[in-house]
Amino acid sequence: MSSEEKQPIQLLQGTLDLIVLRTLASMGAQHAYQIANRLQQISDSLLNLNQGTLYPALVRLEQYGWIKGTWGRTESNREAKYYTITQAGEKALSSETTRWRTMAGLVERLLLEDFQS
């Protein structure tokens, strides 16, 4: 697909929390900029998260107790909040992943269904 054909993806409600949890589970402690860059890289630039999208999700996940933020220094010696997934976050990731796969399977079945029969 050429870069002209790429259209940014709009996330469904609730999916951002899931992919942030997955990113932290697989990559360890990350600050918001690292999370956004990694998701953009993995999505081949189809997913571009701005601060107005990512930061509220990080605050929400921290309030749920699913991630924990601690202040530290970046490679460029700037202060940043590093996020890690908690044990409760690991459990939430597991259950939310199961729920997502169930929903994705249902949508796929419905898209393939011949409603004429």
Residue spans for each PLM region:
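N-terminal helix-turn-helix DNA-binding core of bacterial DNA-binding proteins
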Residues: Q10-T53
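Amphipathic alpha-helical recognition patches that constitute DNA-binding helices
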Residues: T15, I19, A80, T84, ...
